[in-house]
């Protein structure tokens, strides 16, 4: 079982915690991580693209000129795709790009993302994270005590409004709950900061 140092809010070591081998100690599966990231990014696409086809563009319904006798190519409508201002054929229409990987694959991807942070030594476990009031400077002090200078993902066991409000104005810092742990957020941030309660909750969900 991988062991990680536990810190308090001031950055002092207060002990160690053994992380679940089946979650934090597995060999990261890069192929599954790739598939999970592609899936998440696809679901973030708006899909609001739209062009008009020949039934939607403006223009008359009458035949531009008679069929025979003019010497010109026969035409049936000025809304045909070969005309300037005509409709588009097989153009993009509004659609959802979201899709889901199998549940086992999604769970393996999250485990692989968490294990990656352990391998890189980029996971920090806090004994607890308690802020009396939403103040950005208090959160900055916590991060400074933990020597976190890059992008950080803070995972709490439950919704903590004071923590969320204190971190939202700090560039590169994101706060989520243990239920919302996902591959894209974990990999996007350099440091993963979890409370002990959050670790226990994640292990309970992914066990």
Swiss-Prot record:
Signal sequence coordinates: none
Domain of life: Bacteria
One annotated Gene Ontology cellular component of this protein: ribonucleoprotein complex
UniProt-recorded Gene Ontology molecular function terms: rRNA binding; structural constituent of ribosome
KW Ligase (keyword) present: no
Annotated GO biological process: translation
Annotated keywords: Ribonucleoprotein, Ribosomal protein, RNA-binding, rRNA-binding
One family name in Pfam for this protein: Ribosomal_L4
InterPro entries for this protein: Ribosomal_uL4, Ribosomal_uL4-like, Ribosomal_uL4_dom_sf
PANTHER family, alphabetized: 50S RIBOSOMAL PROTEIN L4, LARGE RIBOSOMAL SUBUNIT PROTEIN UL4M
Protein role: One of the primary rRNA binding proteins, this protein initially binds near the 5'-end of the 23S rRNA. It is important during the early stages of 50S assembly. It makes multiple contacts with different domains of the 23S rRNA in the assembled 50S subunit and ribosome. Forms part of the polypeptide exit tunnel.
UniProt record similarity statement: Belongs to the universal ribosomal protein uL4 family.
Record note on quaternary structure: Part of the 50S ribosomal subunit.
Protein name: Large ribosomal subunit protein uL4
